[in-house]
From Swiss-Prot:
PANTHER family: 12S RRNA N4-METHYLCYTIDINE METHYLTRANSFERASE, S-ADENOSYL-METHYLTRANSFERASE MRAW
Binding residues for S-adenosyl-L-methionine: 37-39, 57, 79, 100, 107
Keyword S-adenosyl-L-methionine: yes
Protein name: Ribosomal RNA small subunit methyltransferase H
Upper taxonomic lineage: Bacteria, Pseudomonadati, Bacteroidota, Bacteroidia, Bacteroidales
Catalytic reaction list: cytidine(1402) in 16S rRNA + S-adenosyl-L-methionine = N(4)-methylcytidine(1402) in 16S rRNA + S-adenosyl-L-homocysteine + H(+)
Amino acid sequence: MEKDELTYHVPVLLKESVDGMNIHPDGTYVDVTFGGAGHSREILSRLGEGGRLLGFDQDEDAERNIVNDPHFTFVRSNFRYLQNFLRYHDIEQVDAILADLGVSSHHFDDSERGFSFRFDGALDMRMNKRAGLTAADIVNTYEEERLANIFYLYGELKNSRKLASAIVKARNGQSIRTIGEFLEIIKPLFGREREKKELAKVFQALRIEVNQEMEALKEMLAAATEALKPGGRLVVITYHSLEDRMVKNIMKTGNVEGKAETDFFGNLQTPFRLVNNKVIVPDEAEIERNPRSRSAKLRIAEKK
């Protein structure tokens, strides 16, 4: 793996996830979170002459990592449009779909992108820099109740109402544009011993709202269910409870709400069988090499 790709993002659970795709040399595969190309390169190394891989990423920075391989096609798009682009490329069904839902190290470490509270910079957080809504737009324009709901639902923050109130009060004087200005408002609401964890939750909540992550994930999972061949694999790495719940539900019941449908006779109609009944997590060696992998959970299901 080249240096640029390693600095962009270290692939998490690389062997476990690609093994879980059950790759055949002449199969058709999709990596819906191309990023630093770590998983994609491993998939390509297992393909033969008839094999094909599509890699999705909405971030223009990921285009620097495009793989020069005749079996690879890069799709610059949000993975919520999976089905549209499969049709565009004349692909009816695929053999496996991989999604690593973690934010790339590149995003956290680039101060201009605004994903981390470790750096000052614009309060941005857009995965797609061409998209309109930024984190600054949210904190400056959303009503107090809506802000509180975002922090409660997407950050699971107990003091969501206090946060929203403090933000609305502060912005009455002047707009909040930088991470530094934002931290001055919210830091006093957290105790020093839990400050980093709570700030991470605030930034997670804003990032999810900016990028419509839950809506996009729901649409991608539904599209993946339709796109997979019988025997095809859905392989997903999650990093927080909100996305993990959706993935677990669709694999167990066929929808993200977790409500399994039944046929006329009351038999459960579930599209998948679980390949791993217990989630796969990084071992201590991987966590030591890549601390950001600590919260990763890998789930694998096979289409019936």
